[in-house]
Amino acid sequence: MGSAIGGQSRKKVSARAVLAANVVARRRDKGWSQEALAFECGLHRTFVAHVERQVRNIAIDNIEKLAVALGIEPYELLKP
């Protein structure tokens, strides 16, 4: 499962969970609703909701759209 660091096991967090948490945090930082973010990046509101709830397996193109709308680089959405 996780790697041992200093004798302690570290739980692995999925990329989907990291992406979801980062999208939610960045969206809230901007004071945007899911609908506002969806409008800014040209995606449907339900798509954004599914990403945030970790329901969708998202394509790299859509990660880029979200990042551009949020004013960050795509890799930042995948940084724990």
Predicted segment positions?
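DNA major-groove recognition helix of helix-turn-helix/homeodomain DNA-binding modules
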Residues: 61-76
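Key DNA-contact positions within bacterial/archaeal DNA-binding proteins
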Residues: 46, 56, 75
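Short alpha-helical DNA-recognition segment
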Residues: 31-50
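Helix-turn-helix DNA-binding elements, focusing on the entry/boundary residues of the two helices
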Residues: 23, 34, 45, 60-63
